[in-house]
């Protein structure tokens, strides 16, 4: 086909215009011009062409020829050069008449082969592929094939490809399964313009150009075809065309005197040298014209001659591949394919030079956002070449590609290493790109380091928002699963940005464990191709042998660098969309354009090391020069400042699923942070060397994201101080990360695995985290950290804005902070907002790190609590005493119970989730936003809860150490919070099984279940609780828009609502609300839970154990979801407690609940009394656990909002609310006013979580629960029950709380459906009238359009409307839902909710005067036996069924029967 297509070109080979095919009608005049063709062939070609032309045209041509004959040679040459090339109008009309021309087919064929590649785990919507092809044709002026013809060619190119219909009901699309866009686009071969060769060479130059145009693969394919044909004709096998040619010559089938024959015979023995360039040229022309001729010409000799010439040409190409100096030039592309580097050197340098130019062709892909410049990803690190695997990940760093292209051809295409490779970078070889990796600035020492995991899948997701087509690219070191990038995501500790980072071999251990800088710069957008081209990361580790291997977590510092690029990308995206205003301030407008060129330097200072920390600090300096053109980090970070996230209307307006711009970017950034955190923890586990890493990051800000994302969109300079202490116990004061750049915010994630304090001062992020080298958490260290952090926040007002994070009170940090403020001249509030978002990201990152099993010793980013300085700044102060005491107790309990699980309990937090991974709690705060996406995918059910991390500041108002609480919750919630973002925005398609799965429906053609979700829901769901295929109602609810109510395909759904009205079922449904929330993030965790349940069927399994195993299960299933795991652990604990509380429900159900609130809630759906209890407990737990309440509060202000709902609703309507949240939207106000304050109180009481929670819950619950009590009777009741149960096993309940929060959060997402909201209102103030509640929720929804509400939240209205929140409870919930509906529904919602929480009066949420615990307990007991409560539960069930939860009831019924 190639030859036929090239028929026109042969006519003008001498014209040196091989690229554009000349009009065929010019061919008649040209035969004489084709000296390469023998007379017979030329005449045959002429005759063939003449026959295809009508008589009138022939006569015209004859007339023209007569005129031309009068011209002089010079005039003829001029005429020839003036002949138009390309398709003439007449030809186009002819083509339209025809179904398709060979040229069109070849264009389509080449486009498909150059643009798409097989990838078993991805699918591409057919329409998108065709649309891209059409735009490609439009850009080049080709006539596109019809969709049907294109589909046929697709089948020819990918014979193994199958069509699938993916998507939710009513939104499904037909997809090509097993395909993905290429991560690297091969440079199109341009004609060779080097004529400085011998006569032979000159002749060969043109052919070489033509050969280049003929893809090497095409040539090899043609050779195979020729050999096959020859074997049939000559009945003799030929392995190569050369063999065939020699056979033809020897057998005298063709003349032996021709130059080609002599060349073949001479070259055959010599191997390569025999072939001459001229011969190559002749065959080229001949083959082009001859193949058709073979059919046309009757004489076998002609056919054989053509065949021979073609063979000769092929032979030449092959020889060129082999080191043939003369031919290597002509066939350099081929040589590149084989051993491009070696051959190229042999070949003429001149030829090579053109190829580097060709690399720039990357621009050609521009029509196709998928940047396929394999060069960049591959080239990033020499290791990368060996790591060909990394390339397969499809790091789509369009920006990077562009950047590298701009920087130097070498970076993009391996030009220096293998110029030939550029063109020859055939699909088979592109992944290798080993040598060029070096060319790219980044060198990754550890192959694993470079994870462009998300890119392939992400790309698919990205489509929704083209702004960040690179979203997928976001490198989530942590098994993102794209986040965009998420896919992704190899948990491999090292996540290298597409740019890749060079890390010292010394640092390798660190790098291996995710210390690798994960640069998202490539991921943010393809559009930012112009951004800085390359990321140079130099890691100069100063290693102290003193360090204990166990405490080698320090390397995570390296990971910080990647964050910056990510942030930058996000920023750029924001700039494109519009200036993003911090939600809080809304004042700060950063011009994205300026950011683009800026290089942010993130300097990590190890200055502030605690004396103890200095024990063995391994300091490695990482200079991360990141040209992060687009940092997707931008908006999502802002979730804490919900407004800022969606501030950018463009970003916000994106489809809710794919809030790519802000959400995705943010998502991506968090993934970066997360990976960093994870890497840190991984490094810790791997025993990497401790030490603070200094990073000099130059990050061109694609655009500064104002507001929460970077929170500090200050100057491009960011200094990150991270110090780790050998003594993990001591907080790393010195490990304060000061990030002045919003982009650097990502760096905030504590790099030091042992201890990290990340402080965000102004835009500076101070990450203070203490992580144990051992898996166990050291309460003392935490206390110290908390104190240090507190001091810092106290000392610096600016920091106070960031006070959410406990910032070590180091003068250096303060100075940094101040300096940052001064430098930036940014309002502290803005910074505070940014910090908040950053903190969230950091938190999430930590959680993510936690979620990775490897990071039991997550550095605690306790400091990362973003003091949502906006409105909740006052809440941010840590209660050191409470935090320390409770942390110690809780940590002990949690460690014991969840030591195996990486439940990232925040040490400072009330220890609610304190588990072996005490670090996590802090991390969720800062990582929250960034990690959000990560987390979401990691842990669907945990998602909502995590979101609150940023918000925690407001929530914890009553407690001096609200941050810990929020962080604690973040531990469990951060995941959920992030998850939503991550899932929706970042990994919509397949980023994470969980996160993705929920969000996938919205933004992606992929199935609801994301890759994270291990097996099908059927496999995952608890055998007892028959969950719908979605397996997590919460999952569906979370992405209500995207996912319809879980379909009950998996099991019969004959149950009637009446049955579900059983009292226990009613209670369970109240729990279901929770569960649904959990369900939101439950899918993955739910599956894990289910599996766990399968493993632990006994109904009375020890709650701690049960949830622990489940937790682990989570970790196993979602390495990146590990943070979720803790949440799930908490939730599981609560559920277990519920079980203990006296529901003798089959273990599987309990396990469901226990495993994960979400899971449990799902189970609850299958209405098992135990599950209901669990749900109730979960709801209650959230409140009881003081930490969790904070987290909840955080959710309101931030993406955590849903979680806030969980808390508030949980508190007031723990059971009903959870259901309601999903089915009925309980007004945020109601939730906040009643249960929430109690929850907060609980959180405040860190000392003895159980006692404190009980006491606080009691007093608060008295007011709120009783007042709300009737409203949220179910939830109150549940909350009390949960509280009591949780209090009994404090470790368990803390675990449960986060889950509940998550559940709540999920239900919030569910909010989108008004009916759901209404149901939630079943908790509606004492009146449990579903109808009224529905009206309220509907009104709230009406008031807040999802998208508009998201935008409002992003704009900062939510934060500002703190008091409004109370009045707007329902609307806020709706907002949350609406946020969720926008691209990052969950994240957005959380962010909106969090903002609301932030703005909320702390007293509303958590009345310091009230003690929730006691009241809760009493109320729970009362509710348990309260007919009104039961009625409410039943009503909520009914409303749920009415609102489309009939499937749940159906599910529940069989489950109920089974349970009965």
UniProtKB/Swiss-Prot annotation:
Result when mutating residue 1028 to L: In MRD71; uncertain significance
Start-end of Pro residues biased regions: 947-963
Subcellular location, record wording: Nucleus
Residues modified to Phosphoserine: 322, 379, 418, 455, 662, 1178, 1329
Major subcellular location class: nucleus
Keywords carried by this UniProt record: Acetylation, Autism spectrum disorder, Disease variant, DNA-binding, Intellectual disability, Nucleus, Phosphoprotein, Transcription, Transcription regulation
DNA-binding region location: 108-183
Tissue specificity comment: Widely expressed in many different tissue types including thymus and placenta, with high expression in brain. Expressed in both inhibitory and excitatory neurons in cortex.
Residues annotated with N6-acetyllysine modification: 704
Polar residues composition-biased segments: 337-352, 404-416, 481-513, 563-583, 632-644, 705-715, 917-933, 971-1009
Protein's UniProt keywords contain Transcription regulation: yes
InterPro entries assigned: DNA-bd_RFX, RFX-like, WH-like_DNA-bd_sf, WH_DNA-bd_sf
Disease in which the protein is involved: Intellectual developmental disorder, autosomal dominant 71, with behavioral abnormalities: An autosomal dominant neurodevelopmental disorder characterized by global developmental delay, hypotonia, speech delay, and impaired intellectual development. Most patients manifest neurobehavioral features including autism spectrum disorder and attention-deficit/hyperactivity disorder. Other frequent features include hypersensitivity to sensory stimuli and sleep problems.
Entry function: Transcription factor. Acts as a transcriptional activator by binding to promoter regions of target genes, such as PDCD4, PIK3IP1, MXD4, PNRC1, and RFX5. Plays a role in natural killer (NK) cell maintenance and immunity. May play a role in the process of ciliogenesis in the neural tube and neural tube closure.
The protein's name: DNA-binding protein RFX7
Organism of this sequence: Homo sapiens (Human)
């Amino acid at each position: 086909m190639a030859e036929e297509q090239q028929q026109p070109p042969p006519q003008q080979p001498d014209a040196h215009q091989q690229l554009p095919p000349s009009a065929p009608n010019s061919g008649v005049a040209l035969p004489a011009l084709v000296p390469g063709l023998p007379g017979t062939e030329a005449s045959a070609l002429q005759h063939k062409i003449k026959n295809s032309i009508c008589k009138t045209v022939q006569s015209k041509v004859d007339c023209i020829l007569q005129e031309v004959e009068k011209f002089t040679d010079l005039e003829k040459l001029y005429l020839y050069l003036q002949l138009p090339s390309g398709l003439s109008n007449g030809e186009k009309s002819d083509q339209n008449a025809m179904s398709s021309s060979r040229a069109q087919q070849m264009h389509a064929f080449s486009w498909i082969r150059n643009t798409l590649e097989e990838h078993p785990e991805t699918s591409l919507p057919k329409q998108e592929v065709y649309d891209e092809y059409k735009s490609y044709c439009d850009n080049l002026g080709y006539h596109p094939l019809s969709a049907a013809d294109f589909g046929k060619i697709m089948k020819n190119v990918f014979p193994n490809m199958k069509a699938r219909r993916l998507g939710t009901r009513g939104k499904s699309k037909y997809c090509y399964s097993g395909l993905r866009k290429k991560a690297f686009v091969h440079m199109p071969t341009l004609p060779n313009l080097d004529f400085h060769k011998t006569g032979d060479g000159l002749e060969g130059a043109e052919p070489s150009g033509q050969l280049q145009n003929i893809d090497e693969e095409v040539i090899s394919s043609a050779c195979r075809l020729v050999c096959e044909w020859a074997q049939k004709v000559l009945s003799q096998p030929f392995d190569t065309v050369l063999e065939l040619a020699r056979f033809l010559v020897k057998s005298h089938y063709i003349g032996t005197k021709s130059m080609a024959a002599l060349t073949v015979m001479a070259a055959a023995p010599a191997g390569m040298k025999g072939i001459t360039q001229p011969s190559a040229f002749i065959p080229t022309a001949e083959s082009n014209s001859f193949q058709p001729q073979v059919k046309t010409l009757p004489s076998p000799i002609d056919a054989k001659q053509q065949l021979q010439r073609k063979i000769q040409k092929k032979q030449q190409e092959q020889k060129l591949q082999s080191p043939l100096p003369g031919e290597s030039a002509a066939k350099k592309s081929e040589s590149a394919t084989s051993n491009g580097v070696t051959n190229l050197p042999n070949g003429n340098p001149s030829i090579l030079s053109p190829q580097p130019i060709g690399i720039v062709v990357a621009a050609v892909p521009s029509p196709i956002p998928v940047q396929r410049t394999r060069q960049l990803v591959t080239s990033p690190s020499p290791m990368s070449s060996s790591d060909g695997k990394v390339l397969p990940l499809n790091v789509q760093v369009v920006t990077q590609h562009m950047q590298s292209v701009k920087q130097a051809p070498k970076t993009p295409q391996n030009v220096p290493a293998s110029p030939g490779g550029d063109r020859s970078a055939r699909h088979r070889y592109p992944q290798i790109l080993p040598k060029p990796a070096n060319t790219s600035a980044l060198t990754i020492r550890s192959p694993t380091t470079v994870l462009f995991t998300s890119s392939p899948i992400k790309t698919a997701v990205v489509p929704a928002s083209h702004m960040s087509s690179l979203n997928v690219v976001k490198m989530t070191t942590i098994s993102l699963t794209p986040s965009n990038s998420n896919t992704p995501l190899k948990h491999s500790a090292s996540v290298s940005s597409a740019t890749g980072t060079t890390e010292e071999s010394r640092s390798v251990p660190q790098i291996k464990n995710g210390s690798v800088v994960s640069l998202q710069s490539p991921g943010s957008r393809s559009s930012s191709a112009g951004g800085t081209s390359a990321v140079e990361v130099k890691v100069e580790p100063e290693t102290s042998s003193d360090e204990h291997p166990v405490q080698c977590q320090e390397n995570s510092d390296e990971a910080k660098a990647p964050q910056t690029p990510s942030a930058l990308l996000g920023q750029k995206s924001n700039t494109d969309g519009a200036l993003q205003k911090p939600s809080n301030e809304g004042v700060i407008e950063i011009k994205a354009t300026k950011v683009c060129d800026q290089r942010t330097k993130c300097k990590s200072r190890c200055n502030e090391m605690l004396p103890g920390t200095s024990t063995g600090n391994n300091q490695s300096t990482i200079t991360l020069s990141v040209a992060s053109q687009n940092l997707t980090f931008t908006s999502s970070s802002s979730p804490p400042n919900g407004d800022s996230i969606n501030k950018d209307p463009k970003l916000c307006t994106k489809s809710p699923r794919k809030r790519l711009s802000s959400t995705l970017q943010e998502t991506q950034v968090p993934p970066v942070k997360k990976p960093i955190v994870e890497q840190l923890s991984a490094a810790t586990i791997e025993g990497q060397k401790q030490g603070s890493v200094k990073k000099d990051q130059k990050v061109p800000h694609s655009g500064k994201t104002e507001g929460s994302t970077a929170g500090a969109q200050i100057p491009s300079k960011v200094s990150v101080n991270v110090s780790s202490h050998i003594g993990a116990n001591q907080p790393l004061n010195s490990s304060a990360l000061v990030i002045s750049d919003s982009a650097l915010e990502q760096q905030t994630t504590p790099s030091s695995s042992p201890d990290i304090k990340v402080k965000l001062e102004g835009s500076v992020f101070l990450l203070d985290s203490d992580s144990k080298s051992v898996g166990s958490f050291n309460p003392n260290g935490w206390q110290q950290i908390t104190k240090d952090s507190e001091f810092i926040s106290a000392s610096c007002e600016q920091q106070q804005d960031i006070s959410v994070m406990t910032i070590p009170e180091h003068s250096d940090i303060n100075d940094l902070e101040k300096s940052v403020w001064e430098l930036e001249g940014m309002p502290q509030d803005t910074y505070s907002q940014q910090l908040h978002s950053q903190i969230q990201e950091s938190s999430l990152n930590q959680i993510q790190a936690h979620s990775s099993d490897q990071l039991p010793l997550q550095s605690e980013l306790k400091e990362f609590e973003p003091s949502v300085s906006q409105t909740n700044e006052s809440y941010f102060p840590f209660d050191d005493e409470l935090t320390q005491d409770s942390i110690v107790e809780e940590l002990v309990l949690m460690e014991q119970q969840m030591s195996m699980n990486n439940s990232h309990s925040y040490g400072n937090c009330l220890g609610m989730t304190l588990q072996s991974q005490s670090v996590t709690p802090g991390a969720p705060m800062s990582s929250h936003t960034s990690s959000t996406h990560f987390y979401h995918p990691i842990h669907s059910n945990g998602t909502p809860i995590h979101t609150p991390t940023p918000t925690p500041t407001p929530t914890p108002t009553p407690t001096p150490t609200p941050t810990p609480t929020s962080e604690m919750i973040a531990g469990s919630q951060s995941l959920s919070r992030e998850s939503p973002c991550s899932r929706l925005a970042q990994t919509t398609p397949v980023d994470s099984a969980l996160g993705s799965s929920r969000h996938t429906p919205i933004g992606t053609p992929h199935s609801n279940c994301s890759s994270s979700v291990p097996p099908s829901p059927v496999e995952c769901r608890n055998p007892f609780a028959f969950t719908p295929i979605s397996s997590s109602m919460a999952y569906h609810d979370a992405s209500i828009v995207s996912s319809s109510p879980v379909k009950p395909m998996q099991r019969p759904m004959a149950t009637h609502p009446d049955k579900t009205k059983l009292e226990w079922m009613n209670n369970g449904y109240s729990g279901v609300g929770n569960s649904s929330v959990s369900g939101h993030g439950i899918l993955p965790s739910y599956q894990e839970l289910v599996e766990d349940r399968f493993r632990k069927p006994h109904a009375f399994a020890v709650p701690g154990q049960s949830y622990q195993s489940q937790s682990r299960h989570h970790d196993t299933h979602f390495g990146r979801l590990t943070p979720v795991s803790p949440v799930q652990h908490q939730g599981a604990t609560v559920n277990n407690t519920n079980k203990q509380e006296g529901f003798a429900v089959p273990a599987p159900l309990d396990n469901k609940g226990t495993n994960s609130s979400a899971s449990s809630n799902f189970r609850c759906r299958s209405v098992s009394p135990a599950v209901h209890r669990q749900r109730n407990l979960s709801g209650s737990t959230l409140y009881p656990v003081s930490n969790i309440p904070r987290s909840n509060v955080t959710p309101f202000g931030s993406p955590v909002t849903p979680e806030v709902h969980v808390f508030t609703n949980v508190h007031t309507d723990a059971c009903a609310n959870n259901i309601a949240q999903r089915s009925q939207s309980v007004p945020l106000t109601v939730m906040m006013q009643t249960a929430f304050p109690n929850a907060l109180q609980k959180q405040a009481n860190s000392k003895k979580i159980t006692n404190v929670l009980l006491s606080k819950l009691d007093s608060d619950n008295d007011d709120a629960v009783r007042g709300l009590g009737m409203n949220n009777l179910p939830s109150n009741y549940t909350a009390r029950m949960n509280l009591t149960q949780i209090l009994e096993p404090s470790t368990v309940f803390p675990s449960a709380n986060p889950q509940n929060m998550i559940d709540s959060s999920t239900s919030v997402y569910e909010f989108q459906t008004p009916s759901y909201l209404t149901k939630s209102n079943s908790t509606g103030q004492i009146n449990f009238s579903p109808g009224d509640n529905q009206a309220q929720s509907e009104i709230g929804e009406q008031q807040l359009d999802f998208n508009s509400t998201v935008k409002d939240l992003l704009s900062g209205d939510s934060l500002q409307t703190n008091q409004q929140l109370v009045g707007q409870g329902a609307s806020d919930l709706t907002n949350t839902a609406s946020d969720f509906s926008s691209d990052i529904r969950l994240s957005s919602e959380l962010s909106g909710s969090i903002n609301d929480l932030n703005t909320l009066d702390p007293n509303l949420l958590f009345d310091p005067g009230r003690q929730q615990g006691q009241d809760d307990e009493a109320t729970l007991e009362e509710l348990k036996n309260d007919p009104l409560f039961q009625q409410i539960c039943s009503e909520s069930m009914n409303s749920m069924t009415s609102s489309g939860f009939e499937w749940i009831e159906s599910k529940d019924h069989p489950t109920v029967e089974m349970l009965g």
